[in-house]
């Protein structure tokens, strides 16, 4: 059976791995997932990720989770726009997460970026997820 929400699956793997204090989790590779992980790494929510290619043409992303004093840096990670209900926002209506302490990740015409970058570049888009 085909996966209906690959990004939601990746976020769930990160959430479950952090809850079980795993050092890393893996997920099937895609360009969108890699761009979201780029934003998470730039914002300091994960240590990094690497792409592992298999001989059959498939690839996986190994995500290194980040912890501070034994607790996960990611307290909450949630999908906002889902396959059954897409959420689009203009630059004026980009929400703040946890009063500015968290981030929202958007898919914009200029690429996948964090909410503060979208405000700087004056661009809206699809709200992919929120992280705190």
Curated annotation (Swiss-Prot):
Gene3D superfamilies: 3.30.1370.30, 3.30.1490.10. The keyword Transport does not apply. It comes from the Bacteria. Pfam families: Ribosomal_S8. The keyword Thylakoid does not apply. Keywords: Ribonucleoprotein, Ribosomal protein, RNA-binding, rRNA-binding. PANTHER family: 40S RIBOSOMAL PROTEIN S15A. Belongs to the universal ribosomal protein uS8 family. Part of the 30S ribosomal subunit. Contacts proteins S5 and S12. One of the primary rRNA binding proteins, it binds directly to 16S rRNA central domain where it helps coordinate assembly of the platform of the 30S subunit. This is Small ribosomal subunit protein uS8. It comes from Sinorhizobium fredii (strain NBRC 101917 / NGR234). The gene is rpsH.
């Amino acid at each position: 059976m085909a996966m209906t929400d690959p990004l939601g699956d990746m976020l769930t793997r990160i959430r479950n791995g952090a809850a079980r204090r795993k050092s890393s989790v893996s997920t099937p590779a895609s360009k969108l997932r890699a761009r979201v992980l780029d934003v998470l790494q730039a914002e300091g929510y994960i240590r990094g990720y690497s792409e592992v290619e298999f001989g059959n043409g498939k690839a996986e992303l190994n995500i290194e989770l980040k912890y501070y004093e034994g607790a996960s840096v990611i307290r909450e990670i949630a999908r906002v726009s889902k396959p059954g209900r897409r959420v689009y926002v203009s630059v004026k209506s980009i929400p703040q997460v946890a009063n500015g302490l968290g981030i929202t990740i958007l898919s914009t015409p200029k690429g996948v970026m964090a909410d503060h970058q979208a405000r700087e570049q004056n661009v809206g888009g699809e709200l992919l997820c929120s992280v705190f």
